[in-house]
Amino acid sequence: MLVVEDDPDLGETIVTFLKEEGLDAKLARDGDQAMRLVDQLHPSAMILDLMMPRRDGFSVLRELRADGRINGLPVIVVTAIFGLSERLYATELGAADYVTKPFELDELLERVRNVLASRADEPAATERQTT
């Protein structure tokens, strides 16, 4: 599980919570680091903030989609942006789910488990490592 969040407190909180729930989670603080870690770790899923410095979440989604890495990688977008157009655009780019801030950690965990369960049902899931 890769958590991409530029707010250090929120990022660490999410990673710690996921680890306490038995999931292996790593933190990337921006979109550039996220792309490097996707290639290194081959995560089972990604939690992705949209508004980040250097490379935003939309840019990450576009790159993942352009080269096919989004296939088999469920991405949950987490953002303070409430707009319907942003939600639709994230979905068009391949996001599996969209959670608005603020959110409850239990709600995020439920969504993570849902996308992981959906991913486990896909044949390509067995070809990727779980991180």
Where are these regions (language model features)?
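Alpha4 helix (beta4-alpha4-beta5 surface) of REC/receiver domains from two-component response regulators
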Residues: 15, 59, 82-97, 110
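C-terminal output helix
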Residues: 103-113
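Acidic catalytic/metal-coordinating carboxylates
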Residues: 30-33, 49, 56-62, 94
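Active-site beta3 strand of CheY-like receiver
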Residues: 41-47
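The feature encodes the CheY-like receiver
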Residues: 11, 52-54, 71, 83, ...
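Short amphipathic alpha-helix used as the core "switch/output" element in two-component signaling
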Residues: 36, 58-71
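Two-component/phosphorelay signaling modules centered on CheY-like receiver
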Residues: 7-26, 115
